[in-house]
Amino acid sequence: MKHLLSTHDLHRGAAIQILDTAEEMASVTEREVKKLPALRGRTVVNLFFEDSTRTRISFEAAAKRLSADVINFAAKGSSVSKGESLKDTAQTLEAMSADAVVIRHGASGAPQRLADSGWIDAAVINAGDGTHEHPTQALLDAFTMRRHWAKIFGVSSVGSDVAGMRVAIVGDVLHSRVARSNVWLLHTLGAQVTLVAPPTLLPIGVQTWPCAVSFDLDQTLDAGVDAVMMLRVQGERMHAAFFPSEREYSRRWGFDDARLARLDALGLDETIIMHPGPMNRGLEISSAAADSSRSTVLDQVRNGVSVRMAALYLLLSGGLQQPDQSNPQRNVTNTSNWQETKR
């Protein structure tokens, strides 16, 4: 597997391999000298056509901790702002012998186009394309969930998936590439996913996704959840009124102080609250929830570096598993590690 473009196409074996490799990379981030020589002499280009803070810095840190040379490219202030095409930009990077291109683009499908075009021979990693996908965010979210459950049950997370976990993804699903990537990856890893949103913020065809759909957050919490992932309301992508008011949205679909207390009342002591960031505090999540002991927001940021180190290393070393078409069972990981313990 040369590229990482979508979790839809990521088979179970490769996903587990990335998560397990990320565990090894996490030990590097805990050292005083956070550096490995694994990608020395390789060049990684961060090609960002959209604004980003967390993802760009995370990929830069990941590449540098593997000793790769990093080139940061931003569309603003570059020839792209003068009308240069993606093809011309890609061919320029090819002439500079880039080994990997991490691309974020406002157009859904741009990373796939770059990977399939033949314009560049580098590995391509999708860092978010339009409202389509954001695979490394989903991987770091799964990594965070897997680690949390392993800690609870006192077992190693290595080799395990998240089978049996109940995950609610709440909010602006329509505009969220994070939601799409998480639905596909978590389904592959065995989790039970429920999307919770107003009808106006659910995409057409969501009924075909491998998840349940609910319009009632309180009802979903009452049914029991192990992780609640709040999504940012993406006002910059909204050109119509998708809900009556921010107050109404927060009351019905925001994770406020009352819902934080509701988890305690329901006895859901180990339920975690997640958010991919950036957060709209007071809209989809209250400050009390974001800063609570249940929150994994900073863990997600921390884990993102380890997961992206793993992705870069496996893609550039050629070590990422290919699906075994002759024996599909080899792509299925044993999930009994803590599922038996949980029972």
Curated annotation (Swiss-Prot):
GO terms for cellular component: cytosol. NCBIfam families: asp_carb_tr, PRK00856.1. L-aspartate binds at K82, R177, R232. Belongs to the aspartate/ornithine carbamoyltransferase superfamily. ATCase family. The keyword Nucleus does not apply. The keyword Transferase applies. InterPro entries: Asp/Orn_carbamoyltranf_P-bd, Asp/Orn_carbamoylTrfase, Asp/Orn_carbamoylTrfase_sf, Asp_carbamoyltransf, Asp_carbamoyltransf_Asp/Orn-bd. Keywords: Pyrimidine biosynthesis, Transferase. This is Aspartate carbamoyltransferase catalytic subunit. Residues 323-343 are annotated as: Disordered. Heterododecamer (2C3:3R2) of six catalytic PyrB chains organized as two trimers (C3), and six regulatory PyrI chains organized as three dimers (R2). It catalyses: carbamoyl phosphate + L-aspartate = N-carbamoyl-L-aspartate + phosphate + H(+).
